[in-house]
């Protein structure tokens, strides 16, 4: 899930704001971190939900909150949940006159070149290749690999455990956009016992690499019909990388959980969204497929394709433009009730 690189220059350090706190974690001999926002009127007595929000390729933890979702902390206050935003591995791809910030997650598909069972490579022979992350040094990732090689599944698991040890948590949800959606998808497969629901926004896995959980987990996948970065139907992206069709992903999960009932609906908000909900599944699992017939590669309610390629004061050590204010008028209020009702 690669978007064109953003040209950036060194920015001065900023004073941290109090809206989010930055929490360091020592994981696999590295200091990694996440940002956390606690809702207003939080008490130790009442259990609250935890939502892990995962940024996309070239994104940041704060960019996911500020721009990608158009103010996710406001939704945390409205719905009363704790929001945590992990930061993925990043590096600066240096040119002669510039350097560009690159970040990604090891979603277990983008760090591989070939799919199993002789299904071929995840990109075309003439597809562009992308500079590899330092975590992939010494690993035979192949020419098509573009993502991090860190144990990001374990990192996110650590974040969930850490927050549950310090807060009174009721339910846990993992959501992500693009490469972050792929990461949420992978986490659902690896640790379904830790989450009550997963929301994957425009983050379909690479062709032939769709995973299926072995334990029950509720799942929502959202895609934009006109998305040419992670296409939900046409398989081939603009840069000639291959992605699993949305229908295949939901059908494989539906079969795995033996879902017997399907309800279809067309939701007409600002755009027409084709909704499918699968229920009467094993272990009361629910699966939801949402296809925005006019949407592209953005979070619902956001029009800017570059939203999230920024940082806030909490991440002033990252050389990236400051985030601007984006107001999401309908997307978060469309997705979150569906997620919390799984």
Question: What residue spans do the PLM features occupy?
Answer:
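Serine-hydrolase catalytic machinery in alpha/beta-hydrolase-like enzymes
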Residues: 27-35, 45-173, 186, 190, ...
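A domain-start/cap signature at the N-terminus of enzymes
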Residues: 15-50, 62-82, 134, 148, ...
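Sec-dependent N-terminal signal peptides
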Residues: 3-13
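Functionally engaged cysteine thiol sites
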Residues: 42-44, 57, 149, 162, ...
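Extracellular low-complexity, Gly/Ser/Thr-rich intrinsically disordered linkers
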Residues: 151-155, 160-162, 288-342
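Acidic glycine-/aspartate-rich tracts in secreted/extracellular proteins
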Residues: 41-42, 57-59, 89-92, 96, ...
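The feature captures the conserved acid-bearing segment of alpha/beta-hydrolase catalytic domains
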Residues: 70, 77, 196-284, 291-296
């Amino acid at each position: 899930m690669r978007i064109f690189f953003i040209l950036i220059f060194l920015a001065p350090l900023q004073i941290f704001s109090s809206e989010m706190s930055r929490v360091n974690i020592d994981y696999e001999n590295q200091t990694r971190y996440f940002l956390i926002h606690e809702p207003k009127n939080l008490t130790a007595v009442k259990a609250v939900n935890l939502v892990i929000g995962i940024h996309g390729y070239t994104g940041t933890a704060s960019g996911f909150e500020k721009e990608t979702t158009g103010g996710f902390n406001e939704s945390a206050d409205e719905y009363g949940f704790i929001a945590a935003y992990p930061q993925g591995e990043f590096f600066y791809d240096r040119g002669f006159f510039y350097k560009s910030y690159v970040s990604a997650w090891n979603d277990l598909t983008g760090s591989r070149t070939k799919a199993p069972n002789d299904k071929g490579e995840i990109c075309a022979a003439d597809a562009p290749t992308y500079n590899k992350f330092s975590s992939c040094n010494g690993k035979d990732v192949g020419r098509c690999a573009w993502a991090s090689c860190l144990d990001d599944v374990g990192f996110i698991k650590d974040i969930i455990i850490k927050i549950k040890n310090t807060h009174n948590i009721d339910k846990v949800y993992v959501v992500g956009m693009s490469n972050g959606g792929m990461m949420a998808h992978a986490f659902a497969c690896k640790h379904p016992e830790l989450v009550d629901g997963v929301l994957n926004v425009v983050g379909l896995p690479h062709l032939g690499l769709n995973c299926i959980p072995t334990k029950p987990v509720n799942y929502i996948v959202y895609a934009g019909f006109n998305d040419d970065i992670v296409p939900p139907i046409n398989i081939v992206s603009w840069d000639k990388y291959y992605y699993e069709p949305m229908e295949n992903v939901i059908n494989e999960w539906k079969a795995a959980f033996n879902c017997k009932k399907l309800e279809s609906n067309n939701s007409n908000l600002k755009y027409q969204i084709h909704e499918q909900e699968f229920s009467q599944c094993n272990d009361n699992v629910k699966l939801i497929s949402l296809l925005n017939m006019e949407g592209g590669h953005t979070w619902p309610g956001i029009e800017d394709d570059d939203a999230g390629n920024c940082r806030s004061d909490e991440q002033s050590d990252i050389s990236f433009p400051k985030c601007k204010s984006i107001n999401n008028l309908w997307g978060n209020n469309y997705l979150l009730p569906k997620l919390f009702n799984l």
